[in-house]
Amino acid sequence: MHQVISATTNPAKIQAILQAFEEIFGEGSCHITPVAVESGVPEQPFGSEETRAGARNRVDNAQRLHPQADFWVAIEAGIDDDATFSWVVIDNGVQRGEARSATLPLPAVILDRVRQGEALGPVMSHYTGIDEIGRKEGAIGVFTAGKLTRSSVYYQAVILALSPFHNAVYR
């Protein structure tokens, strides 16, 4: 059984990690241990590089905290080009897989508040009345009328980031 350290305690992210690992390695093939670690970037990262750095930092910090795991996984959400997206970073101590998620364009009224220094989650909670929306369906769930959720979009990115770990051509 793979010991997987999730560098987040966010249920939407943990669900995506668990589903993706079970899709690739089989049901019951992993045990997820969530840990809270620092990203080293602002609460609301801007730009692809800052967001990717946050995910990389979370993986590195999780490795230091739990060095005996088989995999360390981080998902960092950010804002870039008026849209929300995330970077997924997965490491197994030998190699690393990284993937960027799909992007969701955000309305100007939301972006204005985020650019003024508020994080997307609290802004979305204000507009929707859904407490801790970032730990649930997220802006993605709201603006796609539930056709996609934060977790479903993360799931795809985790699957992509896992590619180097089960395809020999990457080695």
Swiss-Prot record:
**Gene Ontology molecular function:** ITPase activity; metal ion binding; nucleotide binding; ribonucleoside triphosphate phosphatase activity
UniProt keywords, alphabetically:
Hydrolase, Magnesium, Manganese, Metal-binding, Nucleotide metabolism, Nucleotide-binding
- Binding, substrate: T8, T9, N10, P11, A12, K13
Cross-referenced InterPro entries: ITPase-like_fam, Non_canon_purine_NTPase, NTPase/PRRC1, YjjX_NTPase
Pfam families attached here?
NTPase_I-T
A Gene Ontology biological process term:
thiamine metabolic process
Residues binding Mg(2+) are E38, Q68
Enzyme nomenclature, EC number: 3.6.1.73
The source's domain of life comes to Bacteria
- State how the cofactor is bound: Binds 1 divalent metal cation per subunit; can use either Mg(2+) or Mn(2+).
Catalytically driven reaction(s) = XTP + H2O = XDP + phosphate + H(+); ITP + H2O = IDP + phosphate + H(+)
**Coiled-coil ranges from the UniProt annotation:** none
Which EC class, in a word?
hydrolase
Q: What PANTHER family is this protein classified in? A: NON-CANONICAL PURINE NTP PHOSPHATASE_PRRC1 DOMAIN-CONTAINING PROTEIN (PTHR34699:SF2), PTHR34699
Which family, according to UniProt?
A: Belongs to the YjjX NTPase family.
- What is its quaternary makeup? Homodimer.
Protein name (Swiss-Prot/TrEMBL): Inosine/xanthosine triphosphatase
Q: Which gene encodes it?
A: yjjX
